[in-house]
Amino acid sequence: MDAFDVIKTPIVSEKTMKLIEEENRLVFYVERKATKEDIKEAIKQLFNAEVAEVNTNITPKGQKKAYIKLKDEYNAGEVAASLGIY
């Protein structure tokens, strides 16, 4: 699966800003069929950042969210800034 097909859009809210600052996490809507391994590879390809863990859930609207924790040597704030959301 192509990295641009896996990652759809970042989620920007007060909650996600708090996750970026305090937990070094990013939150994206992702392709519903994407696995956690697909999401890890897409983040590595698109943002050159190593992923520590990926948690996913499917919203009642049927969209899949991925909560992506970056390894300590990478800063989620810098990745968010490169996206223009922080």
Swiss-Prot record:
InterPro entries membership: Nucleotide-bd_a/b_plait_sf (IPR012677), Ribosomal_uL23 (IPR019985), Ribosomal_uL23-like (IPR013025), Ribosomal_uL23/eL15/eS24_sf (IPR012678), Ribosomal_uL23_CS (IPR001014)
PROSITE patterns the UniProt entry points to: RIBOSOMAL_L23
Domain of life: Archaea
The keyword Heme belongs to this UniProt entry's keyword annotation: no
UniProt-listed SUPFAM superfamilies: Ribosomal proteins S24e, L23 and L15e
Subunit-structure text: Part of the 50S ribosomal subunit. Contacts protein L29.
Record GO biological process: translation
Pfam families linked: Ribosomal_L23
Task of the protein: Binds to 23S rRNA. One of the proteins that surrounds the polypeptide exit tunnel on the outside of the ribosome.
Keywords: Ribonucleoprotein, Ribosomal protein, RNA-binding, rRNA-binding
A GO molecular-function descriptor: structural constituent of ribosome
UniProt name for this protein: Large ribosomal subunit protein uL23
GO cellular component terms attached to this protein's record: ribonucleoprotein complex; ribosome
Annotated organism of origin: Methanococcus vannielii (strain ATCC 35089 / DSM 1224 / JCM 13029 / OCM 148 / SB)
Matches recorded under HAMAP family: Ribosomal_uL23_A, Ribosomal_uL23_B
Family to which the UniProt record says this protein belongs: Belongs to the universal ribosomal protein uL23 family.
